Amino acid sequence: MKVFLIRHGQTDQNKRGILQGSVDTNLNETGRLQAKLLAQRLLPLDIDQIFCSSMKRCRETIAPYLELKPEVPIVYTDLIRERVYGDLEGMNVVEAKKLLNANHPDHYGEGLSHLTSRLLKFWDEYVVPLQGKKKCVIVLCHGGVINVLRTHFMEEKGFTFDKSKLESKIITFNTSITEIEVTEHGTGHIHTFGDASHLESEETGKLIA
């Protein structure tokens, strides 16, 4: 079974470098365009099931695809909402990282262990039962969520991956796709990290971001 972990489209806060966390923001104009390009990217796939964060920026990202394929079942869930960052929310990302580095990461908002438990609860309750039964599943969520799941799969569950793809820093672009293949026994292989090729402009070759 293939599982595509997809980040939401761009928001004004993303563009300005503001940490959103649990703040329920909308897509901006660029984000809405990214969502339409993502829909075209997903259209050829035979998608069995979609799981989507209940936050607006994720709902708005998957909406163009659902307009084209309304028959695909979707579940909106709080379990894959972005991490709660407490007092850091609304701050510049660079400044927020300085505070995180200066203090214990769990000092602000939702602790990493709690976040990981929440995400694994989602995986165990929603994704694991589909292993060996479905062929293609979409998980539309957040950058922080994808990073935690990816790290857990690589370091704790032993999912294999092409190490050459990790030679440079992984950037989880807006609407980028991380493709994972999971067997019915729970083993897996990560095929792509943050693939945003659908955002490449035909005129400039640069990402629409």
Curated annotation (Swiss-Prot):
Entry-linked Gene3D superfamilies: Phosphoglycerate mutase-like
Annotated site residue numbers, Transition state stabilizer: H142
Subcellular compartments: Cytoplasm; Nucleus
Enzyme Commission code(s) on record: 3.1.3.-
Pfam families in the record: His_Phos_1 (PF00300)
GO CC annotations on file: cytoplasm; cytosol; nucleus
GO molecular function, one term: phosphatase activity
Broad class of enzyme this protein falls into: hydrolase
Principal place of residence: cytoplasm
Annotated signal sequence range: none
Active site: H8 (tele-phosphohistidine intermediate), E82 (proton donor/acceptor)
Alphabetized InterPro entries for the sequence: His_Pase_superF_clade-1 (IPR013078), His_PPase_superfam (IPR029033), PG/BPGM_mutase_AS (IPR001345), Phosphoglycerate_Mutase (IPR051695)
Keywords: Cytoplasm, Hydrolase, Nucleus
Entry's Gene Ontology BP terms: positive regulation of pentose-phosphate shunt
Similarity field: Belongs to the phosphoglycerate mutase family. BPG-dependent PGAM subfamily.
The protein, known as: Probable phosphatase C1687.21
